[in-house]
């Protein structure tokens, strides 16, 4: 199981939100590239980035910070937030991203996800953000009546690289991930599922791995708070 350290970008800074609330942002650093280097130096294999402003704006906002990170490290990087058309997808991949995450458009323009996955094999992930089993979009500001598993099934044959499942109510709350829901999703689809939201301890990581079906886990606040030691966690998961 791959551990993805997360850098959430708001106004050019590294932040963490509580349950997706932009007003409840805690700034953990003002130099995203330095944070990326710190994660690399601790042994990270991947990096997970979110353009929070972009998720609300519907277009890239923290491009300068993302580009600084890409210039600072040579790890594969995945990015979500405000990526809603083919030109933006192509632009980010051209700039060196290993993978782009499509969330809102997976609900609103599923054919774009299919087209992108066909054009860029292995480089497109679907981000499914949910509250109470229902999908939320546009920076989690809009809730839909779309069921998580139903949405995931729509992309099983599309060739997407992964599904990143975020339980919004757990995100940034340090309350533990929704292991049951994540495992159920992973067992329901034939696409690798990455857990996000609430991963707050080594025990959480081990419990996710123990399911045998979850491909990865994303953690942000727990790494910044020191609740998880990245180097020790990577060794334990190796």
Swiss-Prot record:
Q: Ligase: present as a keyword of the record? A: no
A single GO cellular-component term on record = cytoplasm
User: Which enzyme class, named as a word?
Assistant: isomerase
Q: What GO biological process terms are annotated to this protein in UniProt? A: L-histidine biosynthetic process; L-tryptophan biosynthetic process
* Catalyzed reactions per annotation: 1-(5-phospho-beta-D-ribosyl)-5-[(5-phospho-beta-D-ribosylamino)methylideneamino]imidazole-4-carboxamide = 5-[(5-phospho-1-deoxy-D-ribulos-1-ylimino)methylamino]-1-(5-phospho-beta-D-ribosyl)imidazole-4-carboxamide
One example of the protein's molecular function in GO is: 1-(5-phosphoribosyl)-5-[(5-phosphoribosylamino)methylideneamino]imidazole-4-carboxamide isomerase activity
- Localisation: Cytoplasm
Protein name per UniProt: 1-(5-phosphoribosyl)-5-[(5-phosphoribosylamino)methylideneamino] imidazole-4-carboxamide isomerase
What is the name of the gene encoding this protein?
hisA
């Amino acid at each position: 199981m791959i551990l993805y350290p997360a850098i959430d970008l708001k106004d050019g800074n590294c932040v963490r939100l509580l349950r997706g609330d932009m007003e409840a942002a805690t700034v953990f650093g003002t130099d995203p590239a330095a944070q990326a280097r710190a994660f690399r130096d601790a042994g990270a294999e991947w990096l997970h980035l979110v353009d929070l402003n972009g998720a609300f704006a519907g277009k890239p906002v923290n491009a300068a910070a993302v580009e600084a990170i890409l210039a600072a490290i040579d790890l594969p990087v995945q990015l979500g937030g405000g990526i809603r058309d083919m030109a933006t997808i192509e632009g980010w991949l051209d700039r060196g991203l290993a993978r782009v995450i499509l969330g809102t458009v997976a609900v609103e323009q599923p054919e774009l996800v299919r087209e992108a996955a066909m054009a860029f094999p292995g480089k497109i992930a679907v981000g499914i953000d949910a509250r109470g089993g229902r999908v939320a979009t546009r920076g989690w500001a809009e809730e839909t009546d779309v069921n998580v598993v139903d949405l995931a099934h729509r992309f099983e044959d599309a060739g997407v690289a992964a599904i990143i499942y975020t339980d919004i109510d757990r995100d940034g709350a340090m309350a533990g991930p929704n292991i049951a829901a994540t495992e159920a999703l992973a067992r329901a689809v034939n696409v690798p599922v990455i857990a996000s939201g609430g991963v707050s301890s080594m025990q959480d990581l081990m419990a996710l791995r123990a399911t045998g079906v979850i491909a990865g886990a994303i953690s942000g606040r727990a790494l910044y708070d020191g609740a998880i030691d990245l180097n020790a966690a990577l060794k334990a998961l190796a």
